[in-house]
């Protein structure tokens, strides 16, 4: 008779701990790229819409991920993601 395999994978964090850690990482990255007032207003909007719920946490994570992805894709000056490589002249010769 077949049996289900034992769970041999790594121990996982509880969903809520992982979600809160992800939110903190996204917030710390977002403050490097967007004005704080924008982020504050986004937080206010999420709070007014969802209140203090997990749905609000998931919504702000989704929005911050989308904002950061688009920001990097367009070409953030802090990142090389989305920036096409340009050849530079050698020996210091440049055109201005």
Swiss-Prot record:
Q: Where are the transmembrane segments?
A: none
Q: Which UniProt keywords apply?
A: Activator, AIDS, Apoptosis, Cell cycle, Host G2/M cell cycle arrest by virus, Host nucleus, Host-virus interaction, Ion channel, Ion transport, Modulation of host cell cycle by virus, Phosphoprotein, Transcription, Transcription regulation, Transport, Viral penetration into host nucleus, Virion, Virus entry into host cell
Q: Where is this region: Homooligomerization?
A: 1-42
PTM per UniProt? Phosphorylated on several residues by host. These phosphorylations regulate VPR activity for the nuclear import of the HIV-1 pre-integration complex.
Q: What is its main location?
A: virion
* Gene3D superfamilies the UniProt entry points to: 6.10.210.10, VpR/VpX protein, C-terminal domain
Protein's GO biological process? DNA-templated transcription; monoatomic ion transmembrane transport; protein homooligomerization; regulation of DNA-templated transcription; symbiont entry into host cell; symbiont-mediated activation of host apoptosis; symbiont-mediated arrest of host cell cycle during G2/M transition; viral penetration into host nucleus
Q: Which Pfam families match?
A: VPR (PF00522)
Where in the sequence is the signal peptide annotated?
Answer: none
The entry sums up its family as follows:
Belongs to the HIV-1 VPR protein family.
Q: What else is known?
A: HIV-1 lineages are divided in three main groups, M (for Major), O (for Outlier), and N (for New, or Non-M, Non-O). The vast majority of strains found worldwide belong to the group M. Group O seems to be endemic to and largely confined to Cameroon and neighboring countries in West Central Africa, where these viruses represent a small minority of HIV-1 strains. The group N is represented by a limited number of isolates from Cameroonian persons. The group M is further subdivided in 9 clades or subtypes (A to D, F to H, J and K).
- Subunit architecture: Homooligomer, may form homodimer. Interacts with p6-gag region of the Pr55 Gag precursor protein through a (Leu-X-X)4 motif near the C-terminus of the P6gag protein. Interacts with host UNG. May interact with host RAD23A/HHR23A. Interacts with host VPRBP/DCAF1, leading to hijack the CUL4A-RBX1-DDB1-DCAF1/VPRBP complex, mediating ubiquitination of host proteins such as TERT and ZGPAT and arrest of the cell cycle in G2 phase.
The protein's name in its UniProt record: Protein Vpr
Query: Gene symbol?
Result: vpr
């Amino acid at each position: 008779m077949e049996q289900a395999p034992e769970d041999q994978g790594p121990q996982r964090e509880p969903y809520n701990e992982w979600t809160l850690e992800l939110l903190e990482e996204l917030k710390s990255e977002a403050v490097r790229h967007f004005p704080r007032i924008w982020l504050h207003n986004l937080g206010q909007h999420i709070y007014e819409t969802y209140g203090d719920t997990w749905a609000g946490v998931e919504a702000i994570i989704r929005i911050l991920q989308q904002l950061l992805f688009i920001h990097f894709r367009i070409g953030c000056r802090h990142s090389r993601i989305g920036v096409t490589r340009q050849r530079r002249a050698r020996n210091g010769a440049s055109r201005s």
